[in-house]
């Protein structure tokens, strides 16, 4: 449990669903904290605080899908930049990187990040980030986040980790040195097959400002209904993950 601070307007311990697009101003240009729900919504904000707390980050962001979250993170880079990725990343991630973002001049290389020497050999002069997925979907290949993050910092690179399969219940990449964490919240975080969502968490105010600018500009935000459903799902995350873990151990 995290992010449970009560609704600021009413004191409700369960965040209300603010199904609203615009907000009344106190005066012309004087807002009460929100102006337009693409930019910010109280229900979505509560979810963003929640995931940031769970991951131990500075700020969280909620998107309309995991791919919306990943794509928005990739929009932090520019034409001519290079990103190194785990070779067994989720198929949707591979597709958007290799078939869509490549059209905008963002280069990529996919390697087995489980071996640091592969990463070292694939780094280029224009490399800006290392994107890890660990364990991977679907082959469950594992990468040492701490070792890669340490190397990335030495090279001045960002470390991005897809934490979908482990969730913050079992793994907190920021504590291991990562700069950005991304989730397809559709899976374990939501847990009930009733919401499609993506989440991201960053470890600095600078990255928070940059990613919020992209989130607001592109507009692939999570709606208040889905934000509320996801918060409700996360309340049972610990119980569910323990059961998943026990079942997996029995099968193994």
Where are these predicted regions, by residue range?
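Short conserved active-site loop signatures built around small residues
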Residues: 1-17
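Active-site donor-binding loop signature of nucleotide-sugar glycosyltransferases
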Residues: 2, 21, 113
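Short Gly/Pro-enriched turn/cap motifs at secondary-structure boundaries
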Residues: 7-10, 40, 189
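Short, basic and Ser/Thr-rich N-terminal targeting/leader segments
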Residues: 12-13, 45, 56, 104
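A generic secondary-structure signal marking the coil-to-beta-strand transition
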Residues: 13-17, 32, 59, 226
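Conserved N-terminal alpha-helix of the aminotransferase class I/II PLP-enzyme fold
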Residues: 22-71, 76, 92-99
């Amino acid at each position: 449990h995290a992010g449970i601070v009560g609704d600021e307007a009413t004191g409700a311990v369960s965040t209300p669903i603010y199904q609203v697009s615009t907000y009344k101003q106190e005066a012309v240009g004087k807002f009460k904290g929100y102006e337009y729900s693409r930019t910010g919504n109280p229900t979505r904000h509560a979810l963003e605080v929640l995931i940031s707390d769970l991951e131990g980050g500075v700020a969280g962001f909620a998107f309309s899908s995991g791919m919306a979250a990943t794509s928005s993170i990739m929009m932090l880079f520019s034409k001519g930049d290079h990103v190194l990725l785990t070779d067994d990343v989720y198929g949707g991630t591979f597709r958007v990187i290799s078939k869509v973002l490549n059209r905008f001049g963002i280069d990529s290389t996919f390697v087995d990040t489980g071996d640091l020497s592969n990463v070292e050999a694939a780094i280029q002069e224009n490399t800006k980030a290392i994107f890890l997925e660990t364990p991977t979907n679907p082959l469950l290949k594992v990468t040492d986040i701490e070792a890669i993050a340490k190397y990335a910092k030495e090279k001045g690179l960002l470390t991005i980790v897809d934490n979908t399969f482990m969730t913050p219940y079992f793994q907190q990449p920021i504590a291991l040195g990562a700069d950005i964490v991304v989730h397809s919240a559709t899976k374990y975080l939501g847990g009930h097959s009733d919401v499609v969502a993506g989440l991201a968490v960053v470890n600095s105010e600078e990255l928070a400002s940059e990613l919020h600018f992209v989130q607001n500009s592109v507009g692939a935000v999570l709606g208040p209904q889905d934000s509320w459903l996801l918060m409700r799902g996360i309340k049972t995350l610990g119980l569910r993950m323990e059961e998943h873990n026990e079942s997996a151990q029995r099968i193994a």
